[in-house]
Amino acid sequence: MEKHHFLFLNIGHFLDHFFILIFATAAALSLTNEWQLSYAELIPYSMAGFIAFGLFSLPSGWLADKWSREGMMFVFFIGIGLTSIGVSTAKSPFEIAVWLFAVGIFASIYHPVGLALIAKGGRNMGMDIAVNGVWGNMGVGFAAFITGIMIDQIGWRSAFWLPGVLSILIGVAYFFNQKENILVKLKEDIIDNSKKINIENTTNSYEIRNLIFRVSMVVFFTTAISSIIFQGTTFAIPKIFEERLSGITSSASVLGSLALFVFAIASFAQIIVGKLLDKIGPKKVFLIVAVIQLVFFMLFVGKYNWLALFIALMFMLGAFGQIPINDYMIGKMAKSDFRARVYAVRYVISFAVWVVVVPLISFVHLNYGFDYLFYILAICALSIFIAVITLPQKLPTTSDI
């Protein structure tokens, strides 16, 4: 796709994850002292933002499909900037919760809309999705770092209003870059004809509809199970490292650095997966990723110290590597007119799973220990492998009907 537009979309993915996580750092480093509340008491106020982040994905996708995706991205940059500035004016935890809910509404725009713009077809769509995914991961990684610096140098309110102003400026630049598309109906997408199934080579469109339905069920099933794996590993890794790397270090900062190292290296697995998606298609790539997850989840059971660190890096390569695959398949199959809505459904499913995973981790760890968590994750990887076996070698598209 056009380079300048792709850069804006990548920056948007960075900012989307960045804004959602500012409060977590501000609460930990500053607000506990200013408002005399514990971290555990403050964190529930962030739930309003996360609920809006998931809940409003569907209407955001619907608006993008009905109006203009470029227009919705302009709304994203301006809206998330203004509401983040609003957070900086809060004088109580309740006011922060209200403003974070507003931030979540605008944050919900990015995934269904940005991915629908990137996944327009073309020979390098897999790589484009993968690169965009890395930008999102960097937003997660840098949120705590940049927020901490701003809190130390200026104060917690600056951690919200400075990025907010920056986002508004980026939104203005985006408007001038995309103004010819912002107020018009969707343009026709690029279609990579080499990857499509020719209708003349199929018995009839009824068979293709059935195939699309079957593949869609696999996509949404693996989306849910992959979300268990991704959330289960990324959320639990800090505590897992505290228990399993005690022979290496007991320093919280060193353990945090090791976790950041694993996440940073593993996130670039998306680039490799993206390139493979463009070359050999999603089925083989998904099977490889599922096998990597299954093998290293099982190997992690009972392991400690340096061996545990190495195995953790390997299964995180699988956890991050799976991220572009379902997005790639949706981009290949979904018709342009409703692609943003399909991506919205995908992220609503992921969000619903995330809500369940955190209590699951707590229950399993409290009653059985982390070894049993990895048995569960291995079963998840095996179920993905079995589901992916049923996929066709070439994906059907709605254009074939």
Feature roles, as predicted:
Residues N132-I182:
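Helix-loop-helix hairpin linking two adjacent transmembrane segments in secondary transporters
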Residues L55-P93, L277-I280:
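Conserved MFS/SLC helix-loop-helix module at the cytosolic interface between two early adjacent transmembrane helices
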Residues L31-T32, L63-A64, I146-I154, F241-E242, ...:
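Interfacial helix-cap and linker-helix signal at transmembrane-aqueous boundaries
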Residues L277-M329:
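C-terminal transmembrane helical hairpin of 12-TM major facilitator-type secondary transporters
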Residues W99-M138:
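Cytoplasmic helix-loop-helix junction between adjacent transmembrane helices
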Residues F23-T25, R214-S267:
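Extracytoplasmic gate region of multi-pass secondary transporters
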Residues M333-Y368:
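A late C-terminal transmembrane helix in Major Facilitator Superfamily
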